[in-house]
Structure formats: C-alpha cells, structure tokens
Amino acid sequence: MRNDADTASMPRVDGDRLWASLERMAQIGATPKGGVCRLALTDLDRESRDLFVQWARDAGCTVRVDRMGNVFARRAGRNPDAAPVMTGSHADSQPTGGRYDGIYGVLGGLEVVRALNDAGIETERPVDVVIWTNEEGSRFAPAMVSAGVFSGVYTLEYGLSRSDGAGRTIGEELERIGYAGAEPVGGYPVHAAYELHIEQGAILERAGKTIGVVTAGQGQRWYEVTLTGVDAHAGTTPMAFRRDALVGAARMISFIEVLGRRYAPDARATVGMIEARPNSRNTVPGGCFFTVEFRHPDDAVLDELDAALRAELARLADETGLGARIEQIFTYAPVPFAPRCIDTVRDAARSLGLSHMDIVSGAGHDACYVARVAPTGMIFVPCVDGLSHNEAEAITPEWATAGADVLLRAVLQSAQEA
C-alpha cells in the first residue's frame, strides 16, 4: 500500500457509490412523504446499524461496540498503537426526519474508508467511523447523550438510565436490540475528529457556497419567564385600569426580537412557548408564561444578552406593575473547534477548488461534545431551502460528493501525521 498524501495523487470518493448507499439506507424507516423515522434504539435503528456494520466489514474494518451502544468501525493503520482519527455522526432520526441528517456523516465516513481502499493507501494512524447513539434526543432526552458519556460530560450510569415516554431505558433497549457492547466508553486519546453534516439551515445555499468550514458551535441559554398581573373582566375593565400579563409578554417578545437582530449575524433569540392564563376569550390575562432561548458562539455576548433581558424585564415590572420572575434553566457553553482541524478542512476545500466559507453551527452535534476530549472540526454542505428535521429535507448528489471529498482529504492528512 502507498503511504503518501501528495496532493497531486490524492484519492477522490466515488460519488455514485456514496449516493447509492444513502438511498439504500433511506429505505430503512422510510416515510410516505420521503423522509425517515428511525427513532433511537428501535428495530429500525437496529436495522440501520446492522447494514452499516455489514458494509464496514465488507470494507475490511473491524467493528466494536461500547457500553453506550456507540459503534466504531476501524480501518487499521500502520501503527496500531497510534491514536485514531475519528469521523462519523448518528443514524437515529426525528419522528418525521429527513434522509440525510446524521447518516450522511456516517456514510461519508464509510466512503472515506472505501476510497482509501480503492487507492491502496495505508495510513499511519487507524481511522474510526462511528455511529453515536441517540444524538437526536427525540426518544430519549437529552440529545447527544452517548457522545456526552464518551467525553465525560455524563456518567455511564446517567446515560444508560435515560428513559423514553413508556419508561424504557437506553440500557434496556440496547440489550433488546443487541447493541449493548462490552467496550468502555471513551477514555482513550483521539488524534483528530471530523464530523460531516448537512448545515440544517439556509446560509450556505443563499451564499452560493458548497462547503461550510465550521469554526464553532453556538452556546445556548434557556430561560422561563412568568409575568403576573390581575385577571379581569374584558368588558368592564377600562384599558387604563388593566394589569394585562399577555400585553407585557408581547412587549418582551418584541424586545427579544430586536435584541437578537442587534447582535446579528451570529445571535439567535427565540421565544418558542407561550401560555396565557386563564386563557379565556373574555378575561384579561392575569398570568403569562413564556420561554426564551439565546444562542451565540461567544460567552461574553451571551452575558450581554442575559443582562439586557433581565434589565428590560425589570423595567417592564416597574412601568406596568406586573410581577416578573425569570429562571435560567439550561446553559451550554460555546464550543470552539480546534484551529488545526479548521485549517485542515479549509485547506481541503481550497485544494479541491470548492467554494467555501466559515460558518458557526447553529445546531448541537456530537462533535460539540467530542471537542472536549479531542481536536475536532466539522464540515457542512448545504441543504435545499435550509430544511431539516423535516421529511422534505434534501441535498444534491454533487453536494454530497463535495463534502465527502473534503472529509477524505482532512481525514487522510490527519491520519498521516506522526
């Protein structure tokens, strides 16, 4: 086998083979509207895992499964003791999910292995292609739990004890489908990790770029806000006498929208839930509950958004007489990816002549947890109209091939490093 990574002789993926693999996998859990439903640790998830394992073994990989059910297909390197280069994503989906979310990164990683085999290239380091268990969180909360156990964010006991709506735990379902592995979860060095994924947004498509060089994952802060006024008769209470909690919420929602735009383009400010009380058509609402979510790749900006929200809420209470309570219920720190992995992805896109741009991941991904224990990078390709978590989710064969070619070059470069 060759062991050089000379740019002129770099291998390319077989785009037709990759697309055929994606189409075949999409038959598992296919929905009438063209999407997929493969909830984590269902029989359909098992079927998708079984197919991946078969393909990986056909490509000469050895397969191991850890105690969280994460599946690792290893292509051997010249030095079996060297820390591996890791790539992959997830195979589970939303209930009405798309055909490419997650699985594109898994099968893109498998195509890297196949392309290296086709070219007869022996890498210095092993290459691992991984399926992470329960990335979506649609059946078992929280999302990305198995990558979280791998990176030490959660304990193994916590991960295995997560339950679905019927009370079935991850541990029980892993046993049921035959993917309760014996391998320890994590605890070993990884030289570099790359995750290939659809963007799940419209930035790349609107910018006319084929590749997104992901520089970071956004931090998140979630809040619950309760405003308290006075229930009152809608017909007998003059406007000047009202303490309307819903009107106060409307003012806050408008402020939050303006606040998010003030910190554009990277900020996201969302009110996703609202509940007026008593929720009667002829009663002035005396109570209102709503949620706020902020996202940004810089913790300092998240602090500013937090301070602005609290200040405006205090101002509202002072001016209207409404009671106001705010509770921060979740925080997730921004995740900067490794500069050397970012540079490797960018250089790969440039060497292939592909249009590209730096981008921040608006969604959470397994790579955001892996980045805590290994140098990590991500590669995005566009998706049509930015749709994801939707049965209409779509990418083109050309985008799929381009992203996998970038992944191939990034993995090969890292796998040849001493």
Where are the regions a protein language model picked out?
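Flexible, glycine/charged-enriched surface loops at secondary-structure junctions
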Residues: R64-D66, E122-P126, G181-V185, T236, ...
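Active-site-adjacent substrate-binding region
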Residues: R12, W19, Q27-T31, G167-T215, ...
